[in-house]
A protein has these predicted regions:
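A generic structural motif
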Residues: 42-46, 64-66, 84-88, 142-144, ...
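One face of beta-strands
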Residues: 37-41, 52, 61-63, 151-153, ...
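Gly/Pro-enriched, hydrophobic low-complexity segments
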Residues: 134-219
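N-terminal, post-signal-peptide region of Sec/Tat-exported proteins
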Residues: 41-77
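Flexible, processing/modification-adjacent segments and terminal tails
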Residues: 17-26, 30-36, 78-151, 171-174
């Protein structure tokens, strides 16, 4: 009887075990790559408003801007992502040296759009939290090299839908550099999608907020 009880406890513990960080990140990438979208959006920072069009066909996501005409497109692969600049001259890959470039002068950088952290191999699940009333897995991701402006990223992933609910990026001195938080969501074609995200940029030296930006998506 004691042996049977011990066995049942082991089985119960195994069944209750959370998914690994690798499994969670794979599900996030899969979810991201399965969407078909054609939406309007804007980046709002103080008096600055940057409208854009968001289109997606499977693993290809494009952010299109005007005045001047320009686009950034993201290709989500199985093992890596590729961010590209699209201009009248053609298509050019965004290099790590350009990761800190700001999108139209806002706090959003090229690296933020590239989603490279979703492919970092050094990742672990550290616990669970509730973000905007959603139950989330909390993950710690460590950069594989210094090509990133972030040494590590804390990520909160919705347990039910695999959506990214919150992200904190830390610089190479371990100081908080940027925080992304989903403020609200919306249903588009029976799927949950981002409606508004708050992006906070911090001064690593003082810890004070340097900029607050909002990214909004409209149906």
């Amino acid at each position: 009887m004691k042996t049977l009880l011990s066995f049942l406890l082991v089985v119960s513990s195994a069944l209750a075990a959370p998914p690994s960080a690798k499994e969670i990140l794979e599900s996030v990438r899969l979810r991201q790559a399965q969407q078909e979208l054609n939406l309007q959006g804007l980046i709002r920072e103080g008096a600055t408003i940057v409208p854009f069009r968001l289109t997606q066909t499977g693993p290809l996501i494009r952010y299109s801007f005007t005045k001047p005409d320009e686009a950034l497109q993201l290709r989500l692969g199985d093992n890596d992502s590729r961010l590209e600049e699209v201009t009248r001259e053609g298509v050019e890959k965004v290099t790590p040296a350009q990761f800190d470039h700001k999108v139209r002068g806002t706090a959003v950088t090229y690296e933020d759009l590239a989603l490279k952290f979703l492919y970092w191999p050094n990742a672990r699940v550290t616990g669970e939290n509730s973000i905007s009333l959603r139950n989330c897995w909390k993950l710690e991701l460590k950069a594989p090299n210094r090509q990133s402006q972030y040494s590590n990223v804390w990520l909160w992933v919705d347990k039910e839908g695999g959506a990214l609910m919150k992200l904190e990026g830390y610089d190479w001195n371990g100081k908080l550099a940027k925080r992304f938080t989903v403020v609200s969501g919306q249903k588009i074609e029976d799927r949950w999608f981002l409606k508004e995200m708050r992006i906070e940029e911090f001064d690593p030296a003082t810890g004070k907020q340097r900029a607050r930006t909002y990214l909004e998506i409209k149906k």
